[in-house]
Amino acid sequence: MTIKKIIVLIGPKGSGKSFIGTLFQKVFQIKFLRVEDWAKVVKKNRNINNENYLKEVFHVIEKGVRESLKQNDAIVFESTGLTVYFDDMLQSLKKDYSLNTIKIIAEKDLCLKRIKTRGQSIHINVSDKQVNMINDAVYKKNIETDFEIDNNNATKEELLEQISEIVKKVITH
């Protein structure tokens, strides 16, 4: 039996995780799960730092990932990777699947600029102050990952090159 594969894009808000995820799907046919859609449903009127919300959202994400892997051999999803619930979810998924993490690198000012110019319909709406707090925490946590993608003004072609190298190592090995 083939081991199902999970790729997790980890990085600050505005680093390009969603865009890179769509490239995984469009170019490499690796299903990109928009977990932020699930988070928006779970959020209701709660603060994004609400412990019950955070716990519930990662439970919903893990359940959704597991469901998706019933139909797909490989999936990719994104996270800032900040909470203990994220860490717990990763450990749980690693027990049953091959899981690789990719750090998306982008400078703080560039992330904020991207957030201000992107469509908000697919993202949880947060203030500049919240974005800065979240991104500062992401940079401080500095999660160790299996791979890195530099998205500081990378062109689509440069991103595809970086993704292709990772796909060769993760999916086709």
Residue ranges and their predicted role:
Residues 12:
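P-loop (Walker A) phosphate-binding loop of NTP-binding proteins
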